[in-house]
Amino acid sequence: MAEMELWFTEQQTPDLGFTCKITKTIYTAKTQYQDLAILETKQFGRMLVLDGAVQTTIADEFCYHELISHVPLFTHPNPKKVAVIGGGDGGVIREILKHDEVEKAYLIEIDREVIEASKKYLPEISCALDDERAEVIITDGIKFVSENKNMFDVIIVDSTDPVGPAVGLFQDSFYKAVFECLKEDGLFVAQTESPFYDQDLIKNVFHAVKSIFPITRLYLGFIPTYPSGLWSFTLGSKKYDPLEVDVSRIKRIDTKYYNPELHKALFALPTFVQEIIK
């Protein structure tokens, strides 16, 4: 009799999916907000899945976490106070705390169970959550941002896809609240999905942010386990332009993806992406 194999498939569009071989189901739970699973995969190591969608894996998490963290943190000349909306796995906090000038990094996560599961089963990613410079606040990110004004140098929106609890993180009213939550020279970045499959979302978010922030930039990165592998990030800034960064500052931190040469290259957009945000 042939040995039975277990495969996981994420349906990324109605007509396309991402499939990988599973060697073990490590943990599953139905939280107050979503279905949570941690799977052991043959190709990518341990994988965090929320509501059937891959959030991160041990093998490729550095791509996403470095891109969403270091671009804004090197764009701001002195980011002392940083907030992460979402990102319960802790990967963004880990990258933020590589910057010595950061005095406090706040993780604003609605689902406590994501944090607890990540700390237990994904220690390589969540390792900085107990750092003395990190503070975890369990609350709704939209509520938190709307209740705090002129507070942060950088805000990073590390949200899940725009369904379920994350829907409000892609709306104009949220970006206005982010603007007010930032200090007078603050900036923010949000993950904004795939240019292949989410063109309307990227266009709408880019123009919403552009109507609020003096400087708005879109940049791209490669994340193998995300839909299409090509991923977009939208940055809104009150004062500092990521295209004017002194890239010599970038060499002083330890990274696997992000580097000085890559920083400005991230903002060189393919023609079809330029067309999306026209």
UniProtKB/Swiss-Prot annotation:
<feature type="binding site">
    <location>
        <position position="109"/>
    </location>
    <ligand>
        <name>S-methyl-5'-thioadenosine</name>
    </ligand>
</feature>
<comment type="subunit">
    <text>Homodimer or homotetramer.</text>
</comment>
<feature type="domain" description="PABS">
    <location>
        <begin position="5"/>
        <end position="238"/>
    </location>
</feature>
<dbReference type="Pfam" id="PF01564">
    <property type="entry name" value="Spermine_synth"/>
</dbReference>
<dbReference type="InterPro" id="IPR029063">
    <property type="entry name" value="SAM-dependent_MTases_sf"/>
</dbReference>
<protein>
    <recommendedName>
        <fullName>Polyamine aminopropyltransferase</fullName>
        <ecNumber>2.5.1.16</ecNumber>
    </recommendedName>
</protein>
<feature type="binding site">
    <location>
        <position position="89"/>
    </location>
    <ligand>
        <name>spermidine</name>
    </ligand>
</feature>
<feature type="binding site">
    <location>
        <position position="34"/>
    </location>
    <ligand>
        <name>S-methyl-5'-thioadenosine</name>
    </ligand>
</feature>
<dbReference type="InterPro" id="IPR035246">
    <property type="entry name" value="Spermidine_synt_N"/>
</dbReference>
<dbReference type="InterPro" id="IPR001045">
    <property type="entry name" value="Spermi_synthase"/>
</dbReference>
<dbReference type="InterPro" id="IPR037163">
    <property type="entry name" value="Spermidine_synt_N_sf"/>
</dbReference>
<comment type="function">
    <text>Catalyzes the irreversible transfer of a propylamine group from the amino donor S-adenosylmethioninamine (decarboxy-AdoMet) to putrescine (1,4-diaminobutane) to yield spermidine.</text>
</comment>
<feature type="binding site">
    <location>
        <position position="165"/>
    </location>
    <ligand>
        <name>S-methyl-5'-thioadenosine</name>
    </ligand>
</feature>
<keyword id="KW-0963">Cytoplasm</keyword>
<keyword id="KW-0808">Transferase</keyword>
<dbReference type="GO" id="GO:0005829">
    <property type="term" value="C:cytosol"/>
</dbReference>
<keyword id="KW-0620">Polyamine biosynthesis</keyword>
<dbReference type="GO" id="GO:0008295">
    <property type="term" value="P:spermidine biosynthetic process"/>
</dbReference>
<comment type="pathway">
    <text>Amine and polyamine biosynthesis; spermidine biosynthesis; spermidine from putrescine: step 1/1.</text>
</comment>
<dbReference type="InterPro" id="IPR030374">
    <property type="entry name" value="PABS"/>
</dbReference>
<comment type="similarity">
    <text>Belongs to the spermidine/spermine synthase family.</text>
</comment>
<feature type="binding site">
    <location>
        <position position="65"/>
    </location>
    <ligand>
        <name>spermidine</name>
    </ligand>
</feature>
<dbReference type="InterPro" id="IPR030373">
    <property type="entry name" value="PABS_CS"/>
</dbReference>
<feature type="binding site">
    <location>
        <begin position="158"/>
        <end position="161"/>
    </location>
    <ligand>
        <name>spermidine</name>
    </ligand>
</feature>
<dbReference type="GO" id="GO:0004766">
    <property type="term" value="F:spermidine synthase activity"/>
</dbReference>
<keyword id="KW-0745">Spermidine biosynthesis</keyword>
<dbReference type="Pfam" id="PF17284">
    <property type="entry name" value="Spermine_synt_N"/>
</dbReference>
<feature type="binding site">
    <location>
        <begin position="140"/>
        <end position="141"/>
    </location>
    <ligand>
        <name>S-methyl-5'-thioadenosine</name>
    </ligand>
</feature>
<feature type="active site" description="Proton acceptor">
    <location>
        <position position="158"/>
    </location>
</feature>
